[in-house]
Structures are given as C-alpha cells and as structure tokens.
Amino acid sequence: MDQQRLTHLKQLEAESIHIIREVAAEFDNPVMMYSIGKDSSVMLHLTRKAFYPGKIPFPLLHVDTDWKFRDMITFRDATAKKYGFDLIVHKNPEGLAAGINPFDHGSSKHTDIMKTQGLKQALNKYGFDAAFGGARRDEEKSRAKERVYSFRDKNHTWDPKNQRPELWRTYNGQINKGESIRVFPLSNWTELDIWQYIYLENIEIVPLYLADVRPVVQRDGMLIMVDDDRMKLREGEQIEHKSVRFRTLGCYPLTGAIESQANTLTEIIEEMLVATSSERQGRAIDHDQSGSMELKKRQGYF
C-alpha cells in the first residue's frame, strides 16, 4: 500500500486494522476490552471493518464497577444488540458484597478492587491470552512509554523496564503459559484524530460527550454530575444546572465534566483544536496519589 496516497487518518486506520488482525491470527484466546467510551467505539468500528463481512472472532469484555453513568450502560446494551457481538460483563463479586464505592472507600481503593482486581478476575476466569485496550500514548505519561504489545506476567503486572523492542510493524507475541499481552491498536492516535475519525465515519457515541444542561456539583476542582440518587453531597455543596460535556468517561463520581456549548461533532473538533490540557485531567483516579496511573498499570490496570 502506498502510504503517500493515504491521509493520516487512513494511515492510522490501516495500522490499527493490521494490529487487530495480527492479534486474531497470532493468539489463541483474545478479548477486546469495551469501556463504552469514544476510544472503545472507534476500536469496535475498526474491528468490525477488519473482519467484515464476517463477525468479530472474539468476545468483548466490560468490567463493570456498578458506578458507570446510566447513559453508558444503556449505550453498551444497545450497541451489543445492534451489532450482535459476544459481550461479557464482569463485576467483582467480592467488591459488590463488601459494598465498595468511591464515596466511602475513595478513588484508589474503589478502582483497585472494582476495576483492576475485577479485570484480573475476568482474564483468569476465561483464560484470555491477549486483551485489546483503547489507550493512546497522548493521554498520559505512563501510557506514552508503553508498547503496542505490552507484556504482562502471570500476575497481570506490567514492568516498564521489561518491554520488548518493536521494530517497524514487527510485534513479538511469544508468551509462556499464564502470561498475556495487552494490545493497544490506537497507540499512535491523538484525541483530535479520534474525534475527526468519529465524524468522518459517523460512529455512534455516548450522548454524554455532547454538551447539554446537566445537574452537577463543584468538588475537588471538578464538576461532578449527579447521575443517580446514590450521589452523596458534602457539606456546603449545592446542585447546579450547567451546560457541560465529558471528554472522558468512567465512574460518574470520579469523572469531571467541562463547561461547554459544543453539542455537535464539528463543535467538539473546534474545541479540540484549541485545547491545552489532556482529557485525563477530568479523571480523579489519575491524581489520587503520586505516579498514580503508572502504579495502577504495574498492578494490572489497563
């Protein structure tokens, strides 16, 4: 393929499809992490393209913390029904039984038990040897130094000093029993690339990415949306109704919105052209301790 004849988005698309097909051919039991966000939606679209007109040859996995936005769960179920892919939803049963939540136990403990430990449970239960994720290198500094094929040991931990060289398009997927690879086909995309591709390909996304008047509270420098009656208000907090949208989606008590009037894809792209901060600025789990994301990844987080 003549790379000079492709736009940069088509080059990114071709690279991602190549990686997805490579994993499907090389591994015995791959799975695709489906977090329902914009990156997952793009990755799902690329995967459908990679195997069209056939069905996706591996399942999608959503590790549900029980604290996702209601719109996310509605979108997840509707998307699975529309495209007919095999969707596995896993919740950490011990965490649910213990009533782990972000209000009483804090973001770090909640994330570790409900997301990291929940993910490791699911990977062990189904014996997956490769897991796709939608992380991009431009999101956060620990993700910037991670390979496309990210090696994980039998405990699913990541050692940034023990990574394999990746020369051009040659990926090393050789693993021993119990080991696995996390695969990031969107590594070289930027947030702006994602939004431009969503616009060009007419990809459906969760409505929370578009600005609307929503109930929010000011907390720890973020606008937290009041998504259901489990939201615990602190002393002095008052619910306000503001025009906001989300650049990133996660557990609703830990995800900050931004004030915005952008309710179309073209308006979002215009915002991205002048944005000076990462979308991860709105994720409390990235800032709950020093080196937070790298520490979580070392422990098995995506």
Curated annotation (Swiss-Prot):
One of its GO terms (biological process) is hydrogen sulfide biosynthetic process. Residues 280-302 are annotated as: Disordered. GO terms for molecular function: ATP binding; sulfate adenylyltransferase (ATP) activity. SUPFAM superfamilies: Adenine nucleotide alpha hydrolases-like. Keywords: ATP-binding, Nucleotide-binding, Nucleotidyltransferase, Transferase. Pathway: Sulfur metabolism; hydrogen sulfide biosynthesis; sulfite from sulfate: step 1/3. Its EC number is 2.7.7.4. Pfam families: PAPS_reduct. It catalyses: sulfate + ATP + H(+) = adenosine 5'-phosphosulfate + diphosphate. It is an enzyme of class 2 (transferase). The keyword ATP-binding applies. Heterodimer composed of CysD, the smaller subunit, and CysN. With CysN forms the ATP sulfurylase (ATPS) that catalyzes the adenylation of sulfate producing adenosine 5'-phosphosulfate (APS) and diphosphate, the first enzymatic step in sulfur assimilation pathway. APS synthesis involves the formation of a high-energy phosphoric-sulfuric acid anhydride bond driven by GTP hydrolysis by CysN coupled to ATP hydrolysis by CysD. Belongs to the PAPS reductase family. CysD subfamily. This is Sulfate adenylyltransferase subunit 2. The gene is cysD.
